[in-house]
């Protein structure tokens, strides 16, 4: 089996996790108490969904997941929520004291007390797997727990499970909407370790997803539940090929191979189509070509950056539902002829496609319409650098005055770590610049940079 373990860290990670597991359960027909009436092989079996769920002797399906937070309120919602019977109580780990939006607390003082417990739980899950494929890590980098404890866990996972791939779904601070003053610090410090310790990171941004909800779903005031349900569709599409049998299956390690040209350039944009409300879907027939085009629209990107300002290095298109390879090839051929969608000149093919025959499932009472086919795109584009330069600029403004730095130093960090992380990100921006440059020009001035 090719199992995946999901690790949900901090409030954002846990709430996205709730939406994902709710959706997985609906997709597989697993009830909130873990029973699965449709499963013929009780107590084991090699069904495709066993990559995400382990099965007890009594036929109960338990998610291969760990939820961690440094304070109890968010995890208590899981403990008392609809799906409380789904999880083993040991999978829900909460501390007593918050990271207080402080990377250093999450990474050093408070985080290090809980990290060994988390690793024990993860080890138990890993021992339960026959062929662990990798980890899916969900967190946000603006707060304290997601950034600090998230980085710490990733560093420790690299030590304990060196070769296993780690896929991150990371919520980055938005350009306008901010939830905390020290977001830029936490993000820069956290990205520093994401660079080292994740193999692929999919960037999400609340503002971009708000706009999609407002524009495409006509929700005037989107809540986090609306956002998370949209994000969970993306994550479900990515993992569908692990959980169902399809025509063109895509493995987690395959994402890595196809999307990451250089180890540091592994930050991806994601988009999903069709995002459409039930009232509209009734009147529209969405062909493969249409949903493919709409996945490439700058407004469908789930992070605030404009792919028209950069070049694509690689794209992964995951279709699900009533889709045949012939239509996909035609749609991709059309995309390649478009002038607005530019690829770097050293990567002529640039597309990886996956097809899964399981049509997209929607949460009853949710916002998305039930459709016959959908596509999720994960793309590696040089325009992602916009996200980093935005955060770096805000970081510089604050750090020039050393504002708020004493909170971090007081928790055992050194100022050197700030400048080290900032330099690493400056190098990352430069890497993106060089990757997007025309390769013919690049040959004369190679010598100066190194």
UniProtKB/Swiss-Prot annotation:
GO-annotated biological processes: microtubule-based process
Localization per record: Cytoplasm, Cytoskeleton
Residues reported in the UniProt entry to bind GTP: 11, 71, 144-145, 179, 206, 228
Modified residues (N6-acetyllysine): 40
Protein residues bound to Mg(2+): 71
One family name in Pfam for this protein: Tubulin_C
First-level EC class: hydrolase
CDD domains named among the record's database cross-references: alpha_tubulin
Catalyses which reaction(s): GTP + H2O = GDP + phosphate + H(+)
UniProt-listed Gene3D superfamilies: Helix hairpin bin, Tubulin/FtsZ, C-terminal domain, Tubulin/FtsZ, GTPase domain
Coiled-coil boundaries: none
EC number of this enzyme: 3.6.5.-
SMART domains in the cross-refs: Tubulin (SM00864), Tubulin_C (SM00865)
Quaternary structure and partners: Dimer of alpha and beta chains. A typical microtubule is a hollow water-filled tube with an outer diameter of 25 nm and an inner diameter of 15 nM. Alpha-beta heterodimers associate head-to-tail to form protofilaments running lengthwise along the microtubule wall with the beta-tubulin subunit facing the microtubule plus end conferring a structural polarity. Microtubules usually have 13 protofilaments but different protofilament numbers can be found in some organisms and specialized cells.
The protein's name in its UniProt record: Tubulin alpha chain
Lineage of source species: Eukaryota, Viridiplantae, Streptophyta, Embryophyta, Tracheophyta
Gene: TUBA
């Amino acid at each position: 089996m090719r199992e995946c373990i999901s690790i949900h860290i901090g409030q954002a990670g846990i709430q996205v996790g709730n939406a994902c597991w709710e959706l997985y359960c609906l997709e597989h027909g697993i009830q909130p108490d873990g029973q699965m009436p449709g499963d013929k092989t009780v107590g084991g079996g090699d069904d495709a969904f066993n990559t995400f769920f382990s099965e007890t002797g009594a036929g109960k399906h338990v998610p291969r997941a760990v939820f961690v937070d440094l304070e109890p309120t968010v995890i208590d919602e899981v403990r008392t929520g609809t799906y409380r019977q789904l999880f083993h109580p040991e999978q829900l780990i909460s501390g007593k004291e918050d990271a207080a939006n402080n990377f250093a607390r999450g990474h050093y003082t408070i985080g290090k007390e809980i990290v060994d417990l988390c690793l024990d739980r993860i080890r138990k899950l890993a021992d339960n797997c026959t062929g662990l494929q990798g980890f899916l890590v969900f967190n946000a980098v603006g707060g304290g727990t997601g950034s600090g404890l998230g980085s710490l866990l990733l560093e420790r996972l690299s030590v304990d499970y060196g070769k296993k791939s780690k896929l991150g779904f990371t919520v980055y601070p938005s350009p306008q909407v901010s939830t905390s003053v020290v977001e830029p610090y936490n993000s820069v410090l956290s990205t520093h370790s994401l660079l080292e310790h994740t193999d692929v990171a999919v960037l999400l941004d609340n503002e971009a997803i708000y706009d999609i909800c407002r524009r495409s779903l006509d929700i005037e005031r989107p809540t986090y539940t609306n956002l998370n349900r949209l994000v969970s569709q993306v994550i479900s599409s990515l993992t569908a090929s692990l959980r169902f049998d399809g025509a063109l299956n895509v493995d987690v390690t395959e994402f890595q191979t196809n999307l990451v040209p250089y180890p540091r350039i592994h930050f991806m944009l994601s988009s999903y189509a069709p995002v459409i409300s039930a009232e509209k879907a009734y009147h529209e027939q969405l062909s493969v070509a249409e949903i493919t085009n709409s996945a490439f629209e700058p407004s469908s990107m789930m992070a605030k950056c404009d792919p028209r300002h950069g070049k694509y290095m690689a794209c992964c298109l995951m279709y699900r539902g009533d889709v045949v390879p012939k239509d996909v090839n035609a749609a991709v051929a059309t995309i390649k002829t478009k002038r607005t969608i530019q690829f770097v000149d050293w990567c002529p093919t640039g597309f990886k496609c996956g097809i899964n025959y399981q049509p997209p499932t929607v949460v009853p009472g949710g916002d998305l319409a039930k459709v016959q086919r959908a596509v999720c795109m994960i793309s590696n584009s040089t325009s992602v650098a916009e996200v980093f330069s935005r955060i770096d600029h805000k970081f510089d403004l604050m750090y020039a005055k050393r504002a708020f730095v004493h909170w971090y130093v007081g928790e055992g960090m050194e100022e050197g770590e700030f400048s080290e992380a900032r330099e690493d990100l400056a190098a990352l921006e430069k890497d993106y610049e060089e990757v997007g440059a025309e390769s013919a020009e690049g040959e004369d001035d190679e010598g100066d940079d190194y």
